[in-house]
Amino acid sequence: MVDEHKAHKAILAYEKGWLAFSLAMLFVFIALIAYTLATHTAGVIPAGKLERVDPTTVRQEGPWADPAQAVVQTGPNQYTVYVLAFAFGYQPNPIEVPQGAEIVFKITSPDVIHGFHVEGTNINVEVLPGEVSTVRYTFKRPGEYRIICNQYCGLGHQNMFGTIVVKE
């Protein structure tokens, strides 16, 4: 009987150790999640603030209708570029912007999901029909930057390219 009591106490101590370890890990995970939410969600646009357009009429009306008017100067050294991603290209193409200017890209699609990735930069946006994807960037070096679609959008996907020309 005494041996059983000692064995039970040993198992109980072992279980308490694992319980304490599990609770400590739970608190660590909760702290990490709280830290991530507090520090990595800045700048995320809540769903209610999304800009939407009618994908069936986006080519006929609004700022995406006329490629000649797609690059708009909104302030000193600030531009907004309205980009239409469609199967299988980008409009306007090429996009010409000045070096050092703050560029706000507003990208949408009239047909299917596309990607808008500018090589050599951290611009990488998923473009959904009916929604306007917005991204800001300042090109510090002049040159040509290639836009590629990195979201499969159909049989001509591999040929979907565009160009951004950054002028001095």
Swiss-Prot record:
SUPFAM superfamilies according to UniProt: Cupredoxins, Cytochrome c oxidase subunit II-like, transmembrane region
GO-annotated cellular components: plasma membrane
Enzyme class, broadest EC rank: translocase
Cell location: Cell membrane
Entry annotated with the keyword Electron transport: yes
Catalysed reactions listed for this entry: 4 Fe(II)-[cytochrome c] + O2 + 8 H(+)(in) = 4 Fe(III)-[cytochrome c] + 2 H2O + 4 H(+)(out)
Membrane topology: Single-pass membrane protein
Residues in the Cytoplasmic compartment per record: 1-3
Binding site for Cu cation: H114, C149, C153, H157
Keyword vocabulary terms for this entry: Cell membrane, Copper, Electron transport, Membrane, Metal-binding, Respiratory chain, Translocase, Transmembrane, Transmembrane helix, Transport
This enzyme's EC code(s): 7.1.1.9
Chief location: membrane
Gene Ontology molecular function: any one: cytochrome-c oxidase activity
One Pfam family named in its UniProt record: COX2
Positions on the Periplasmic side per record topology: 39-168
Entry keyword Protein biosynthesis: no
InterPro entries noted in UniProt: Ba3_CcO_II_C (IPR034214), CcO_II-like_C (IPR002429), Copper_CuA (IPR001505), Cupredoxin (IPR008972), Cyt_c_oxidase_su2_TM_sf (IPR036257), Cyt_c_oxidase_su2a_TM_dom (IPR015209), NosZ/Cyto_c_oxidase_sub2 (IPR051403)
Stretches that traverse the bilayer: 4-38
Domain of life (superkingdom): Bacteria
Membership in a protein family: Belongs to the cytochrome c oxidase subunit 2 family.
Function: Subunits I and II form the functional core of the enzyme complex. Electrons originating in cytochrome c are transferred via heme a and Cu(A) to the binuclear center formed by heme a3 and Cu(B).
Protein name: Cytochrome c oxidase subunit 2
